UniProtKB/Swiss-Prot annotation:
This is Regulatory protein RecX. Belongs to the RecX family. NCBIfam families: PRK00117.3-3 (NF001057). One of its GO terms (biological process) is regulation of DNA repair. Its main location: cytoplasm. Keywords: Cytoplasm. Modulates RecA activity. One of its GO terms (cellular component) is cytoplasm. It is found in: Cytoplasm. The keyword Cytoplasm applies. It comes from Haemophilus influenzae (strain ATCC 51907 / DSM 11121 / KW20 / Rd).
Length: 152
């Protein structure tokens, strides 16, 4: 057991939460062996210093504050942070976020005059912005008086 590997993880975790995937990548960059990585991670997880579930909850809250929807958050957690789909599903199910209300608030903030600007170009801009922020069309299309079929 390498105390150097363990100390490295503890040092990282003392600053912020990390997913297991992120910690593994950081330790591999520092050329720790797989055995050292596994051992250090196991010790931290046993002490509840590292938890993908807790990381996902914190990440969800931070991304919601920045105006991102469920699709974008799910994708980032899975692809960029390496969190398992099961954990992501649990965290999203347990969250009490009203994605429709969030989409409406973001739409009002980013496009304050969206009701008055009903040009096709403006609708296209809103549509692209909302989709790129991870909102499903059913969460915002009726807010701009539009059906998805109008864009097909």
């Amino acid at each position: 057991m390498s105390s150097l590997a363990f100390n490295y993880i503890v040092n990282l975790l003392s600053r912020r939460e990390y997913s297991e995937f992120e910690l593994r990548n950081k330790m591999q960059e520092k050329n720790f062996s797989e055995e050292e990585i596994d051992d250090a991670l196991s010790r931290c997880q046993a002490k509840n210093w590292q938890s993908d579930r807790r990381f996902s909850e914190n990440y969800l809250n931070s991304r919601v504050q920045k105006g991102y929807g469920v699709g974008r958050i799910r994708q980032e957690l899975r692809q960029l942070k390496g969190v398992s789909s099961d954990i992501i599903d649990e965290v999203l199910m347990e969250s009490e976020i009203d994605w429709y209300e969030m989409a409406e608030n973001l739409l009002r903030k980013k496009f304050p005059n969206y009701n008055e600007q009903q040009t096709p170009k403006m609708k296209q801009k809103i549509w692209q912005y909302m989709l790129s922020h991870g909102f499903r069309s059913d969460e915002f299309a009726d807010l701009i008086g539009q059906n998805q079929s109008e864009w097909d």
